[in-house]
Regions:
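Classical nucleotidyltransferase
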Residues: 1-18
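A short glycine-rich, His/Asp/Glu-containing loop-to-beta-strand
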Residues: 15-53, 109
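Conserved hydrophobic/aromatic beta-strand scaffold that supports enzyme active sites
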Residues: 33-37, 55, 77, 85-87
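Short glycine/proline-enriched turns and hinge-like loops at secondary-structure junctions
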Residues: 48-50, 57-58, 80, 98-101
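Glycine- and acidic-residue-biased ligand/ion/polar-headgroup-sensing regions
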Residues: 51-71
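Short acidic-glycine-tyrosine-enriched beta hairpin
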Residues: 69-93
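Double-stranded beta-helix
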Residues: 95-130
Length: 130
């Protein structure tokens, strides 16, 4: 580990998930900033939030995003690469997938009436092969 990684681990709370991990970098009542690290060949659930918007900034690597403003049947796949940004508004379905052999790092800015992990509806998980 580099000294910057050791400092980050000491300063910020890390949470592990099946798709990777994230650090909570900053938090206020209506705002939260995270660093998401999506591991190679992993992905998140196809999900939406009712009380918050999210802005994603890809800081390292690239990923695919399944995205729909309304229904799962209308989803589109887009690719995000380093320094790309993407806006997900509340109630819009979204899923990050990393099909590559290297990590994808994303700075996620959440803002809205509620910025906690309970504000989520999942349609399906990454490993369900949809």
């Amino acid at each position: 580990n580099s000294s910057s990684e050791i400092l980050k681990n000491w300063n910020y709370q890390k949470e592990k998930r099946i798709w990777g991990e994230f650090y909570n970098l900053f938090e206020e009542k209506y705002l939260k900033v995270k660093e998401l690290i999506v591991f190679p060949n992993q992905g998140m659930s196809f999900q939406r939030h009712f009380h918050r918007n999210e802005i994603w900034f890809v800081s390292e690597g690239s990923c695919k995003v399944n995205y729909s403003k309304s229904t799962e049947e209308e989803k589109k796949e887009i690719t995000l690469t380093k320094f790309d940004t993407f806006l997900v508004k509340k109630n819009e379905w979204h899923q990050i997938i990393n099909p590559h052999q290297t990590e994808c790092k994303i700075i996620e800015i959440q803002y809205g009436d509620k910025v906690d992990e309970s504000d989520i509806e999942r349609l399906y998980y990454f490993n369900e092969g949809k």
